[in-house]
């Protein structure tokens, strides 16, 4: 073909591509697949909606009652529906907070090691250990802390022992969240910092960590939400109390899961109301933490999209 002919061919308008309509067989397959996935979604959604409806319907009266959030059960008889869950809510937040104080620094340092320094056998062993720890049941973590902290070292049951068990459950979540966020930081930023003569540790602290911090904070909040409802550690490692205990290292301390378990043995109607009220309170706490994590992710995403 001559050059002139090729130029003329290029000057011709491009004909629109004509798509053939889907055959009946393909339309049927698409309809079947759409119906299957929608049905699966509805089937998975029904238990969740039903659970929330039952808990809200049965616990709403308790959580909206005066004094529920500001009073404890000190001096309240089993047949009386009085007081509130202030002592249990305080214990839940304190135990999760102490666990976070211990687990977050250790988890973040482990994540930094795996992403920035980890090579060879040590890195593989650490990754394998974190994976195994992520699948450990809460009762196993509680029994381990009981055998080491209480039976072997001689410390008494306390909220701090519960926090140690929660650390074992939080640690793999924090490590994975930190590792994923650190890997999302572009290597070009690290290389540019190294080219300017900045040491590696200062590059991590001044450049890598601030960029990954919103995602890391979100992962930390999700790890806290994962452990606030754990029941096995509080059943094994601490006793129940009807009043507030400010000492983390000594004495019994109530929590929302422990309050639910204790009130289940109360045959009075007041116990029934407290059980469902505590369950709804626990759901509200977990939902609030998850909402905070989602808001942090949303704000961080919007800041990245803003023009410079």
From Swiss-Prot:
<feature type="transmembrane region" description="Helical">
    <location>
        <begin position="204"/>
        <end position="224"/>
    </location>
</feature>
<dbReference type="Pfam" id="PF00528">
    <property type="entry name" value="BPD_transp_1"/>
</dbReference>
<dbReference type="GO" id="GO:0035435">
    <property type="term" value="P:phosphate ion transmembrane transport"/>
</dbReference>
<comment type="function">
    <text>Part of the binding-protein-dependent transport system for phosphate; probably responsible for the translocation of the substrate across the membrane.</text>
</comment>
<feature type="transmembrane region" description="Helical">
    <location>
        <begin position="96"/>
        <end position="116"/>
    </location>
</feature>
<protein>
    <recommendedName>
        <fullName>Phosphate transport system permease protein PstA 1</fullName>
    </recommendedName>
</protein>
<dbReference type="InterPro" id="IPR035906">
    <property type="entry name" value="MetI-like_sf"/>
</dbReference>
<feature type="transmembrane region" description="Helical">
    <location>
        <begin position="155"/>
        <end position="175"/>
    </location>
</feature>
<keyword id="KW-0813">Transport</keyword>
<feature type="domain" description="ABC transmembrane type-1">
    <location>
        <begin position="89"/>
        <end position="297"/>
    </location>
</feature>
<keyword id="KW-0472">Membrane</keyword>
<keyword id="KW-0592">Phosphate transport</keyword>
<feature type="transmembrane region" description="Helical">
    <location>
        <begin position="132"/>
        <end position="152"/>
    </location>
</feature>
<comment type="subunit">
    <text>The complex is composed of two ATP-binding proteins (PstB), two transmembrane proteins (PstC and PstA) and a solute-binding protein (PstS).</text>
</comment>
<dbReference type="GO" id="GO:0051701">
    <property type="term" value="P:biological process involved in interaction with host"/>
</dbReference>
<keyword id="KW-1003">Cell membrane</keyword>
<keyword id="KW-0812">Transmembrane</keyword>
<dbReference type="InterPro" id="IPR005672">
    <property type="entry name" value="Phosphate_PstA"/>
</dbReference>
<dbReference type="GO" id="GO:0005315">
    <property type="term" value="F:phosphate transmembrane transporter activity"/>
</dbReference>
<feature type="transmembrane region" description="Helical">
    <location>
        <begin position="36"/>
        <end position="56"/>
    </location>
</feature>
<keyword id="KW-1133">Transmembrane helix</keyword>
<dbReference type="InterPro" id="IPR051408">
    <property type="entry name" value="Phosphate_transprt_permease"/>
</dbReference>
<comment type="similarity">
    <text>Belongs to the binding-protein-dependent transport system permease family. CysTW subfamily.</text>
</comment>
<feature type="transmembrane region" description="Helical">
    <location>
        <begin position="276"/>
        <end position="296"/>
    </location>
</feature>
<dbReference type="GO" id="GO:0005886">
    <property type="term" value="C:plasma membrane"/>
</dbReference>
<dbReference type="InterPro" id="IPR000515">
    <property type="entry name" value="MetI-like"/>
</dbReference>
